[in-house]
Design a protein with these regions (language model features):
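Bacterial Sec-dependent N-terminal signal peptides
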Residues: 1-11
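Hydrophobic faces of well-ordered beta-strands that scaffold small-molecule active sites
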Residues: 52-56, 94-96, 134-136, 185, ...
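Extracellular glycoside hydrolase catalytic/binding regions
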Residues: 75, 167-170, 174, 179-182, ...
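Hydrophobic core
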Residues: 12, 16-20
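Solvent-exposed loop/turn segments at secondary-structure junctions
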Residues: 58-62, 93, 99-104, 140-144, ...
Length: 271
């Protein structure tokens, strides 16, 4: 129930913000299907199309000792039957939290393990192949409480963090660049410096920088990514610390496709 409430809150937030912003066996099949038509939906249309969402939590973001492990938190492996059950219950969107952690090779250009990306893609295909929206993010990598967490806005080594973050999103975005509008990328989840209370301006500036890197990097990978809806959070995905004067900055979208009508936006905010 908590996951459903969280997902519903995200979709409702998308509606408010968008309005205010004037396995290898399935890979080939989906890539071909995804590359056929991209429907450019404006903020009202995408909100209606996504409807109520369901969060597939404690699965692909689960980890043990710094290594992603889909069953580490006690859930069985995700199946297409689960996605279909959610669809039958009236959900139109599925959020898929994903942790990468040790699946990223720091000694090889921050390359993400291909078998892990295959599994992420397989779960995405469960959704889009059944005409549902899928939201894919970077999840536990930004937690100070998760072993191996590295996307840490309070860290002093921001140069390395930003390079790693950019490299990761280049790979994720490239993997999915031919998917249609049913796929949405979310930059990160509940990112903050681990200290509850008033946000640190310095750490918040790093979060803003991550969001800008995310938008620019995804757009530049080409395919359909230059017109795809993107989802970004503020401090700890907190509505007050995002909407009020605590330091949040909406990223610019300089590489948005010319196919998008002038004045229209393609960035959502998660709160």
């Amino acid at each position: 129930m908590a996951f459903r409430k969280k997902a519903l809150a995200i979709v409702m937030s998308m509606a408010m913000v968008a309005t205010s912003l004037s396995i290898p066996t399935t890979t080939a099949k989906t890539a071909e299907a995804a590359g056929t038509t991209f429907n450019n939906l404006n903020q009202s249309q995408i909100t209606e199309a996504m409807g109520v969402g369901y969060n597939l939590g404690n699965s692909l973001e689960a980890a043990s000792s710094g290594t992603p492990n889909e069953t580490a938190y006690g859930n069985p492996k995700l199946t297409e039957d689960l996605v279909l059950a959610a669809k039958d219950a009236g959900f139109k969107s599925i959020r898929i939290p994903v942790s990468y952690l040790s699946m990223i090779d720091d000694n090889n250009g921050y390359k993400i393990d291909s078998s892990w990306l295959d599994r992420v893609q397989q779960v995405v295909d469960y959704c889009v192949d059944n005409d549902m929206y899928a939201i894919v993010n970077m999840h536990g990598d930004g937690y100070t409480t998760v072993t191996g967490g590295w996307l840490l806005c309070g860290s002093s080594d921001q140069t390395k963090i930003k390079a790693k973050y950019k490299a990761c999103w280049e790979q994720i975005a490239d993997r999915f660049k031919n998917y249609d509008e049913h796929l949405i990328f979310e930059s990160m989840n509940e990112e903050f410096d681990g200290t509850y209370g008033t946000p640190s301006r310095t750490a918040y500036a790093n979060i803003n920088a991550y969001n800008q890197i995310f938008v620019d990097t995804v757009r530049k990978t080409g395919g359909n990514n230059d017109q795809r809806w993107l989802l970004i959070p503020g401090w700890n995905t907190n509505i007050d610390y995002t909407a009020e004067n605590y330091g949040f900055a909406l990223p610019t979208d300089d590489y948005l496709s010319s196919k998008i009508a002038s004045g229209e936006k393609r960035i959502m905010i998660s709160v």
